[in-house]
Amino acid sequence: LPQEEIEAASKSMSSMSFRQEFEASFETFSGGIFKEEWFKEDEEPEDGNYCIAVDPAGYEDSEKERNLKRSRLDETSIAVVKIDRDRWWVKEIIHGRWNIKETAKKILGAAVRVESNSVGIETGALRNAILPYLEDEMRTENQWLSLVELRHGGKKKIDRITWSLQGRMEHG
């Protein structure tokens, strides 16, 4: 491999991923995926555009119907991130367990507050379930968004998080 390619990979990948891919080191990563010192607080950048990404979880009403316990279920997450070139600034992460209508209101509200015109929602049955409610909410509020399907390529959640965010966090 060209040296430039190796250097570029070392600056964009997490150190664990780089060692695994380029040095054939298959150590386990104890102590968590992210290190506390990788998280940096800063003022909101002037430039950039907001992106909203949603990872839906079960909705409260359907959970009650199936007698599922709240404490064992995942939460819906709504990430509000400003992107300027290759820099990300996380404004907020809205998370919780809500009924499907309240979830739709929270998604639309987040997008309206930061004037984002599109929202990405992770593909799957839960995305399909919320779309009609989100469309109703957009119609009621007369606020329209482009709804983008976010695909995960069949990878496990922990792998997606590690590969997509770990290197970015480690290298700033």
Where are these regions (language model features)?
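Short coil-to-beta strand junction motifs in C2/discoidin
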Residues: 70-76
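Short beta-strand micro-motifs in enzyme catalytic cores
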Residues: 52, 76-77
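Generic structural signal for beta-strand residues in well-ordered domains
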Residues: 44-45, 71, 112
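Mg2+-dependent endonuclease catalytic cores in nucleic-acid-processing enzymes, primarily RNase H-like
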Residues: 29, 67, 79-172
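Alpha-helix initiation and N-capping motif
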Residues: 2-6, 15-19, 75, 87, ...
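Intrinsic structural disorder
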Residues: 1-2, 7, 71, 122, ...
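ATPase catalytic-site recognition across NTP-hydrolyzing enzymes
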Residues: 1-67
